Swiss-Prot record:
Heterotetramer of 2 PyrK and 2 PyrD type B subunits. The lineage of its organism: Bacteria, Bacillati, Bacillota, Bacilli, Bacillales. Signal peptide: none annotated. Pathway: Pyrimidine metabolism; UMP biosynthesis via de novo pathway; orotate from (S)-dihydroorotate (NAD(+) route): step 1/1. One of its GO terms (biological process) is 'de novo' UMP biosynthetic process. It comes from the Bacteria. Its cofactor is [2Fe-2S] cluster; FAD. Keywords: 2Fe-2S, Electron transport, FAD, Flavoprotein, Iron, Iron-sulfur, Metal-binding, Pyrimidine biosynthesis, Transport. One of its GO terms (molecular function) is electron transfer activity. Pfam families: DHODB_Fe-S_bind, NAD_binding_1. This is Dihydroorotate dehydrogenase B (NAD(+)), electron transfer subunit. InterPro entries: Cyt_c3_hydrogenase_gsu, Dihydroorotate_DH_ele_sf, Dihydroorotate_DH_Fe-S-bd, Dihydroorotate_DHASE_ETsu, FAD-bd_FR_type, FNR_nucleotide-bd, OxRdtase_FAD/NAD-bd, PyrK_electron_transfer. Residues 1-99 form the FAD-binding FR-type domain. It comes from Listeria welshimeri serovar 6b (strain ATCC 35897 / DSM 20650 / CCUG 15529 / CIP 8149 / NCTC 11857 / SLCC 5334 / V8).
């Protein structure tokens, strides 16, 4: 974990209120799939950092890409960043996806919903690099909300579901996965709680890994703002920012 200043290389709106932010900094060298950064808004009245998942990184260039949706004052502040600006960053944080499983999977299903899609990109890239056959299933509300379909096709097969049917299959991600004839060796998912519950119920929990989207304040496990009940004892809790955000499905109670 490192508090540092990162330089803005470029920022582009790539979907409705969804921005692609490219940053440069030495902390990229410590990144792994499924981790996140805590970004500090520039406005003095916005005291809390905002957690943004890491979409991808290039360690040789020391750059990373963050994708986020403008949903409040903090992310609205980030959307005003432009080339050569700097931003105060804490991270990389959290325990991400374990891609060094034994035995090594031959097939992997990556399910993302909305702003839970970004961390699936780097994960899929690294799995494909290890020879794993990757299938992406991405869910959005509408075609205007979709992003990174073309980028993901470089590393696997991509399926899209939209609630209004304007792109791909009408419905939810599980309306696609329920028609798959073969069960993958491992399942990874990130997205809204309702989607994660559906994924958890659809596949064997011992080979399903969920990245939880909880509101965070500190990002380092000090404030207990992002807790999640443990599956074996709901009176005990995980701190999502420190113990996760990635958990095996049978470890957590959603």
């Amino acid at each position: 974990m490192l508090q540092t200043e990162m330089k803005v290389i470029q920022q582009t709106e790539i979907a409705d209120k969804v921005y692609e932010l490219i940053l440069s900094g030495e902390c990229v060298m410590d990144m792994s799939p499924g981790q996140f950064l805590m970004l500090k808004p520039s406005r003095s009245d916005l005291l809390m950092r905002r957690p943004i998942s890491i979409c991808s990184y290039d360690k040789s260039a020391q750059t990373c890409i963050l994708l986020y949706r403008v949903e409040g004052d903090g992310t609205e502040d980030f959307s005003k960043l432009s080339s050569d600006d700097t931003i105060d960053v804490l991270g990389p944080l959290g325990k991400g996806f374990d891609i060094d499983r034994t035995p090594e999977p031959k097939t992997a299903l990556l399910i993302g919903g909305g702003i839970g899609v970004p961390p699936m990109y780097q994960l899929g890239k690294e799995l494909a690099g290890k020879g794993v056959q990757v299938t992406f299933v991405n869910g959005f509300q509408s075609a205007k909300d979709s992003f990174y379909e073309k980028e993901m096709t470089k590393y696997g097969t991509v399926h899209i579901a939209t609630v209004d049917g304007t792109l791909g299959t009408q419905g939810f991600v599980t309306d696609i996965t329920k028609n798959f004839l073969e069960e993958p060796d491992v399942i990874y998912s990130c997205g809204p709680k309702a989607m994660l519950e559906a994924v958890k119920a659809s596949f064997p929990e011992t080979k399903t890994y969920l990245s939880l989207e909880e509101r965070m304040a500190c990002g380092i496990g000090a404030c207990y703002a992002c807790v999640c009940p443990k599956a074996d004892d709901r009176n005990k809790q995980f701190k999502v920012c420190e113990d996760g955000p990635v958990f095996r499905a049978d470890e957590v109670s959603l």
